[in-house]
Design a protein with these regions (language model features):
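Conserved coupling/switch loops of ABC nucleotide-binding domains, chiefly the family-specific signature
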Residues: 61-64, 216
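Non-catalytic connector elements of ABC transporters
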Residues: 244, 254-350
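The feature captures the beta-strand-to-loop junction immediately N-terminal to the Walker
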Residues: 40-42
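ABC ATPase nucleotide-binding domains
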Residues: 85-87, 91, 95-236
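A short, flexible loop at the N-terminus of ABC-type nucleotide-binding domains that lies
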Residues: 1-10, 14-26, 75-79, 113
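Helix-to-loop junction immediately C-terminal to a conserved catalytic motif
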Residues: 55
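Conserved ABC transporter NBD signature motif
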Residues: 63-74
Length: 350
C-alpha cells in the first residue's frame, strides 16, 4: 500500500446520457496506491459508469482522472484504454474460448520474448492457485477457476490499476468468500491498486481497504469498512451498508449521552446539550433482558439463521419495529414480553 506511483485520483467527474439523465455529478474519489477500494451503491447510482470512464470505454463530460500523477482524462486529454496501464476483470471472466488458459493469461504480454511470456504466465497462474492448468481450455474450468484466470490475465502486464466489475456475481455463494480472499491476496502480492465495483455490502466490507458509497452520482462517504459501519455519514448510508436502528434522541446536559425511547445512549462524539436528532445503532448493539427492565418490548417475529437470529420487537414510543441480533439459545418467542437495552455508542445526525 501507499505506492504513490499508482494513486488513483478522480476529481469533478461528470457524465450524462442525455440532458435528462445525469449519472455522475461531480464525483470525487482518491484511492491510495496499492489499496483495494470497493465502489458500493444501489443499481443506477453510477458505479459502473465510473468504472467505464476510468477504463477509457466512455468519455466523461467533465472532470479528471489521474493514475500515479499521469492524467488519463482531463481537458483535451483522453488516453485510449490500451495506454492506461489498467487491467480489467469483467463480471464473468470473458475468457477467449478458443485459447488455452496459458494463452489467455499471456494475451496482453506484447513486446516480450517467448521465454519471458512463459515465465510471467506461469508466475501468474501460480499466484492465483492454478499452477499446472495452462494447457486446459476455458470450458474445462469451473466458474471460480475462470475468474482466477481472468485475474491472472489482468495482472500479467503489471498494470498500475485493476478494475473488477462485480466479478463474483456468477459464483455460488459457497465459493464467493474463498475466491474473494484469494483475489485480495493476489492483488496484495502484486501491489496493484484496485477498484472493485459491487452492490454487495458484505463483499465490500470484508474485501476492501476502503469503501466508497455512491449515491445519485456522488460519493456519499468514503472510509475504512470499520468506520463506514460504525460511523456512517448519515442515516441513508447507515441503512445501506447494513441493518440500522434509527432512534429519535435528545442530547443530555453533559453532551456525552442522549435520551431515547430505548433509554440513555452514549454518543460517539460530544454534542450540544438539548440538541435533537436521529441516533444510528446496529442491531448487535441491542440486548434482550428480563421483562422487568426499565425499557420493555414485545416480540413480534423471530428469524433464525443458524449462526444467529433476528428478533423483531415493538417498543413504546417508537413508530417502527426494532431488530435485535441474538446469538446462542433464543430466550423469547413471538408474543412474549422482554426487556431491552443498548450497549456501545451511537452516532447522532440532524
Amino acid at each position: 500500500m501507499n505506492d504513490r506511483h499508482n494513486d488513483l485520483r478522480v476529481e469533478g467527474l461528470a457524465k450524462s446520457y442525455g440532458p435528462e439523465a445525469p449519472v455522475l455529478r461531480g464525483l470525487d474519489l482518491t484511492v491510495p496506491g496499492g489499496a483495494l477500494a470497493a465502489v458500493l451503491g444501489p443499481s443506477g447510482c453510477g458505479k459502473t459508469t465510473l468504472l467505464r470512464v476510468v477504463a477509457g470505454f466512455l468519455r466523461a463530460d467533465a472532470g479528471t482522472v489521474a493514475l500515479g500523477g499521469r492524467t488519463l482524462v482531463g481537458p483535451g486529454v483522453q488516453l485510449p484504454p490500451e495506454r492506461r496501464r489498467i487491467g480489467i476483470v469483467p463480471q464473468e471472466g470473458a475468457l477467449f474460448p478458443h485459447l488455452s488458459v496459458a494463452r489467455n493469461v499471456a494475451f496482453g504480454l506484447t513486446g516480450t520474448d517467448r521465454d519471458e511470456r512463459r515465465r510471467r504466465t506461469e508466475e501468474m497462474l501460480d499466484l492465483v492457485g492454478l499452477s499446472g492448468y495452462g494447457d486446459r481450455m476455458p470450458h474445462e474450468l469451473s466458474g471460480g477457476q475462470q475468474q482466477r484466470v481472468a485475474l491472472a490475465r489482468a495482472l500479467a502486464p503489471r498494470p498500475g490499476l485493476v478494475l473488477l466489475d462485480e466479478p463474483f456475481n456468477a459464483l455460488d455463494s459457497a465459493l464467493r468468500a474463498g475466491i474473494r480472499a484469494d483475489v485480495r491476496a493476489a492483488l496484495r502480492a502484486t501491489g496493484a491498486t484496485a477498484l472493485l465495483v459491487t452492490h454487495d455490502q458484505q463483499e465490500a466490507l470484508s474485501t476492501a481497504d476502503v469503501v466508497a458509497v455512491v449515491r445519485q452520482g456522488r460519493i456519499a462517504q468514503c472510509d475504512t469498512p470499520q468506520d463506514l459501519y460504525r460511523r456512517p455519514a448519515d442515516p441513508w448510508v447507515a441503512g445501506f451498508v447494513g441493518d440500522a436502528v434509527l432512534l429519535p434522541g435528545t442530547v443530555g446536559d453533559g453532551g456525552a449521552t442522549a435520551t431515547t425511547p430505548l433509554g440513555t445512549v452514549a454518543l460517539t462524539a460530544p454534542a450540544d446539550p438539548g440538541r435533537t436528532g436521529t441516533l444510528v445503532l446496529r442491531p448487535e448493539q441491542l440486548r434482550l433482558t428480563d421483562a422487568g427492565a426499565a425499557v420493555r418490548a414485545t416480540v413480534t417475529d423471530v428469524c433464525f439463521y443458524g449462526h444467529d437470529a433476528k428478533v423483531t420487537v415493538t417498543v413504546e414510543g417508537l413508530d417502527t419495529p426494532v431488530d435485535v441480533r441474538v446469538t446462542g439459545p433464543l430466550p423469547v418467542g413471538p408474543g412474549r414480553r422482554t426487556g431491552i437495552h443498548v450497549t456501545g455508542e451511537a452516532t447522532l445526525h440532524p
